[in-house]
C-alpha cells in the first residue's frame, strides 16, 4: 500500500518507519521535500520511502495519514487539494494549553477534530485512529510480559473501506484494532488521548504505555 503521511515529525516518522518494515511504500508530504524533518526518516527507511510537496503526496498515496500539529490542519487541508473520494486517517488531537497551564481539548464535546477535518476536506472519507498514544508506541508496539495480550488501537469512521484499511495498518504495527463506531465517536477517542497525554506528560509517567482490553 502507498501511504502518504502528511508530516514527518516524531509521529509521522515513527509510523512511516514501522509501516515500511511491514512492506508498505511511504510518501512523506511536507513543505520542504529536500531538507528539514524528512531527512532522518528517509535515511532510516531507505528505498521504500520518498518525500514530496503535500499535494503531490496526496495524489500519489492510496491512503492519507494526517500527522501534523492540530493548529496546522486548516492550512494543510487547503494545501492537500482535491480530496474527493480520498481516505484520510486523522491522527491529530485538538489539545492545547489553557490559561491555567493545563492541557485541554479545544473543541469541547459537541464536535471533534476528526469531524472538523471531515467538514473541511470536502468529499473525503475520514477515519480517526493512531491518536491515543505518543509516537514512541508506534515506533515499537512490543510490550513483553503480557502473554498473548496485544495493545488495543481504538478507531472510528463512517466509511467501511476506511475501517478495513485502519484494521490492516493497526495489525501491521502489532495492535489489536477495536472499532468504536461512526466518526462521531472521535468525541470519545480524543479525550482518551488527552488522558494519555496528561498521564505521560503531566504526571511524569514513562510514555511507553498503552491501553489493553482484558476479556472474559
PLM region descriptions:
Residues 23, 60-62, 124:
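Short, well-ordered alpha-helix to beta-strand connector turns
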Residues 51, 125-129, 178-180:
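General beta-strand structural signal in soluble alpha/beta enzymes
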Residues 91-144:
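Rossmann-fold NAD(P)-binding glycine/threonine-rich loop
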Residues 79-85, 121, 145-147:
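Short, conserved loop/helix-junction motifs that constitute active-site signature segments
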Residues 148-216:
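Active-site-lining helix/loop region of Rossmann-like oxidoreductase modules
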Residues 45-101:
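Rossmann-like NAD(P)-binding element
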Amino acid at each position: 500500500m502507498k501511504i502518504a503521511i502528511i508530516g514527518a515529525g516524531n509521529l509521522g516518522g515513527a509510523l512511516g518507519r514501522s509501516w515500511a518494515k511491514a512492506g508498505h511504500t511511504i510518501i512523506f508530504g511536507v513543505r520542504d521535500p529536500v531538507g528539514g524533518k524528512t531527512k532522518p526518516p528517509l535515511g532510516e527507511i531507505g528505498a521504500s520511502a520518498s518525500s514530496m510537496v503535500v499535494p503531490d503526496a496526496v495524489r500519489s498515496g492510496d491512503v492519507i495519514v494526517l500527522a501534523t500539529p492540530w493548529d496546522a490542519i486548516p492550512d494543510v487541508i487547503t494545501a492537500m487539494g482535491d480530496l474527493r473520494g480520498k481516505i484520510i486517517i486523522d491522527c491529530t488531537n485538538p489539545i492545547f494549553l489553557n490559561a491555567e497551564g493545563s492541557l485541554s481539548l479545544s473543541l469541547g464535546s459537541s464536535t471533534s477534530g476528526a469531524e472538523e477535518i471531515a467538514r473541511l476536506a470536502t468529499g473525503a472519507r475520514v477515519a480517526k485512529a493512531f491518536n491515543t498514544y505518543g509516537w514512541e508506541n508506534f515506533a515499537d508496539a512490543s510490550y513483553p510480559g503480557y502473554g498473548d495480550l496485544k495493545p488495543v488501537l481504538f478507531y472510528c469512521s463512517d466509511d467501511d473501506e476506511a475501517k478495513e484499511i485502519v484494521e490492516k495498518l493497526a495489525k501491521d504495527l502489532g495492535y489489536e484494532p477495536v472499532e468504536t463506531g461512526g466518526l462521531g465517536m472521535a468525541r470519545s477517542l480524543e479525550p482518551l488521548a488527552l488522558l494519555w497525554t496528561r498521564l505521560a506528560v503531566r504526571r511524569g509517567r514513562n510514555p511507553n504505555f498503552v491501553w489493553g482490553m482484558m476479556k472474559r
